[in-house]
């Protein structure tokens, strides 16, 4: 089991990498794990019957919101975008053929059949995949390359999370301009109002309304399926598009221009990564059932219906989705589309929260405020700082780009870049985790990369049209995450070198007669084998120790969850000292007071430890970092790291420590 430094450190744990925090500060010394490893959580039998149906409907509301709203703008971009083709019969059949085979190959074949098998104890997503393959890499260079690759993929996902709410809501509200052209100027203001309310609502949590997300998307998929069937019945010849020959002849006929149309076709698979990222919430089977049983058939019917409309009326390319609806159903369709767009946006926002939580626990992001909005659902969280950054960026995109067509140019690069990163990491899973031979793994990887790279290159030409935005956003996030990781590792190394081994300290305490005072003192340390500097400072300056001293280490591991029976190890060190080591996965948030309160109820092999809250004082270190130290990090990165450390959430708040029971002791460190 690979242990990673718990994200704690800089401005919050005494001069030592307080592991009790996940970024309690920039340090975090990975100490040898006191346990040999963790058992796999008990596997529940695959859901069946009503349970499977309920999970599948739930998956519709979370997993398929992004890809489910793609019909609002995908074909409009293929035929009416800056690189669109004229909607002749041959081109319509060719584009629809590409749409069908893109959905079949990328979503059904690549993600459903292969990538979803590469789970990190049930969890999926870029960071979970990176943590999974990182366990098998033994060389320093190899781990560094995997880290950089995974962080850039995660950074691209943030760009996706910014664009999706903007383009989905814009695409839905643009139906108003179809119903009443005079209302076109109201599209952007209406979109802004909806997004403002959406982001303001986040602090309330989705526990109360989350139950309706699935039914809303169920109605949405039923609606688009009916609209599609209506279009197909008007011109059934569109079904010829299912033949791959039409896609191939499209490229032969249009050449380079036809290749560029892939930049619009890729919009039909923009939610593919969500299938993998949300795997831990619903499980593989419900996600597959929802896709094959409803989502894919409904999407395919709607795209074919739009294609049939274009065969009959090429002028409908300006907005084929809404023009597919009969006039009397236009406003109800707009309402349902807007509701679906809000659900899709919520799914991406919640995904950004989850991704940030993972990054914090894995040590790639400074601490931010994490609020649990549901007592029953552990995954229901709200991150105020992330929410406001996403909200501000989304509103800026809407005001800057104005239309979903312009935003579509920015969308594809983030999605296709993430797909390439996933393929490269998945190759390592096949080779290192599954033991596939090169002759078996490389052909599949090459096939995936050929398709991914084709979509990516077709979108690169849109760089000046808006593609620069996700690249800029990803570069910014990547710089922040990599800077935090480098700075934290450097600080951890400095603190480790300056630390004192625990066994030597305990031998010294046993020899010396230090004055003791009543009560319990809790010291946080990220290194179970060392003494936290804050304890040394306390002893040096105050020259006393409490009757009972508890050293708490919270270690973050590269697995999503830790089984409760394996959560805690405790032992008595002698002279009134106790050591508590707690283990957490990257999907969990530690609560130190609750952890200590639970000790008497746990069946621990070590001593029975009872903590009286009003007789307990928590000691934390607060480091003041200076950029003039000996580490080989560039000065600009040191300064950026220091700014991030200063603005990180305090360790006491992150660990839920009672403010009136916390004592902080400062130290100056030259980084």
Curated annotation (Swiss-Prot):
Residue ranges of the region described as Disordered: 1-43
One protein family per Pfam: K_trans_C
Location in or out of the cell: Cell inner membrane
Membrane topology: Multi-pass membrane protein
Residues annotated as transmembrane: 52-72, 92-112, 147-167, 181-201, 209-229, 255-275, 291-311, 323-343, 381-401, 407-427, 441-461, 465-485
Keyword Cell inner membrane: yes
One Gene Ontology CC term in the entry: plasma membrane
UniProt keywords, alphabetically: Cell inner membrane, Cell membrane, Ion transport, Membrane, Potassium, Potassium transport, Symport, Transmembrane, Transmembrane helix, Transport
Molecular functions (GO terms): potassium ion transmembrane transporter activity; symporter activity
Reaction(s) catalysed by this chain's protein: K(+)(in) + H(+)(in) = K(+)(out) + H(+)(out)
Main location: membrane
Sequence ranges of Low complexity compositional bias: 10-37
Function noted in UniProt: Transport of potassium into the cell. Likely operates as a K(+):H(+) symporter.
Family indicated by similarity: Belongs to the HAK/KUP transporter (TC 2.A.72) family.
Protein name (record): Probable potassium transport system protein Kup
Naturally occurring in which organism (per UniProt): Anaeromyxobacter sp. (strain K)
Species classification: Bacteria, Pseudomonadati, Myxococcota, Myxococcia, Myxococcales
Gene: kup
């Amino acid at each position: 089991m690979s242990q990673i430094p718990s994200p704690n450190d800089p401005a919050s744990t005494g001069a030592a990498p307080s592991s009790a925090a996940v970024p309690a500060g920039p340090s975090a010394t990975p100490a040898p794990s006191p346990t040999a490893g963790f058992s796999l959580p008990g596997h529940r039998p695959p859901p069946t019957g009503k349970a499977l149906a309920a999970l599948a409907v739930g998956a519709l509301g979370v997993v398929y919101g992004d890809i489910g709203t793609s019909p609002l703008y995908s074909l409009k971009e293929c035929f009416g975008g800056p690189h669109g083709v004229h909607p002749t019969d041959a081109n319509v059949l060719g584009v629809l053929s590409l749409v069908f085979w893109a959905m079949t190959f990328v979503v059904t074949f690549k993600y459903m059949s292969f990538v979803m098998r590469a789970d990190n104890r049930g969890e999926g997503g870029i960071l979970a995949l990176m943590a999974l393959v990182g366990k098998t890499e033994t060389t320093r260079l190899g781990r560094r390359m995997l880290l950089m690759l995974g962080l850039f993929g995660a950074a691209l996902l943030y760009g996706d999370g910014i664009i999706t709410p903007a383009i989905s809501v814009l695409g839905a509200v643009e139906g108003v301009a179809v119903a009443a052209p005079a209302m076109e100027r109201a599209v952007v203001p209406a979109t802004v109002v909806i997004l403002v309310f959406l982001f303001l609502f986040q602090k309330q949590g989705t526990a109360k309304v989350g139950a309706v997300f699935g039914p809303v998307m169920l109605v949405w998929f039923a609606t688009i399926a009916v609209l599609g069937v209506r279009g197909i019945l008007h011109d059934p010849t569109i079904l010829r598009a299912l033949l791959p020959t039409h896609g191939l002849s499209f490229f032969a006929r249009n050449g380079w221009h036809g290749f560029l149309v892939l930049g619009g076709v890729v919009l039909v698979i923009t939610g593919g990564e969500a299938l993998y990222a949300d795997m831990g919430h619903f499980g593989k089977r419900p996600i597959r059932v929802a896709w094959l049983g409803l989502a894919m058939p409904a999407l395919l019917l709607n795209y074919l219906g739009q294609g049939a409309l274009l065969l009959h009326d090429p002028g409908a390319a300006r907005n084929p989705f809404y023009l597919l609806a009969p006039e009397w159903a236009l406003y109800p369709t707009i309402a349902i589309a807007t509701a679906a767009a809000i659900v899709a946006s919520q799914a991406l926002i919640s995904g950004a929260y989850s991704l940030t939580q993972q990054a914090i626990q894995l040590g790639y992001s400074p601490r931010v405020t994490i609020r649990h909005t549901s007592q029953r659902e552990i995954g229901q969280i709200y991150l105020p700082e992330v929410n406001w950054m996403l909200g501000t960026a989304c509103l800026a995109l809407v005001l800057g780009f104005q239309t979903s067509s312009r935003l579509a140019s920015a969308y594809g690069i983030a999605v296709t870049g993430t797909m390439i990163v996933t393929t490269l990491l998945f190759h390592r899973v096949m080779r290192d985790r599954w033991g596939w031979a090169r002759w078996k793994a490389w052909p599949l990887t090459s096939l995936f990369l050929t398709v991914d790279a084709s979509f990516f290159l077709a979108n690169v030409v849109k760089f000046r049209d808006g593609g620069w935005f996700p690249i800029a956003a990803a570069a910014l996030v990547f710089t922040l995450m990599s800077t935090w990781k480098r700075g934290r590792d450097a600080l951890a190394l400095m603190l480790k070198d300056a630390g004192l081994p625990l066994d030597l300290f305990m031998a010294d305490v046993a020899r010396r007669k230090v004055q003791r005072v009543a009560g319990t003192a809790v010291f946080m340390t990220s290194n179970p084998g060392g003494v936290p500097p804050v304890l040394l400072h306390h002893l040096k300056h105050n020259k006393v120790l409490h009757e009972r001293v508890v050293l708490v280490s919270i270690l973050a591991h590269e697995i999503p969850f830790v089984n409760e029976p394996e959560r805690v190890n405790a032992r008595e060190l002698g002279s009134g000292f106790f050591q508590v080591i707690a283990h957490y996965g990257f999907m969990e948030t530690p609560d130190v007071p609750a952890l200590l309160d639970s000790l008497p109820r746990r069946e621990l092999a070590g001593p029975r430890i009872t903590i009286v809250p009003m007789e307990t004082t928590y000691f934390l270190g607060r480091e003041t970092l200076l950029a003039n130290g000996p580490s080989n990090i560039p000065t600009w990165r040191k300064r950026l790291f220091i700014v991030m450390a200063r603005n990180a959430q305090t360790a006491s708040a992150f660990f839920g420590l009672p403010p009136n029971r916390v004592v902080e002791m400062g130290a100056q460190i030259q980084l």
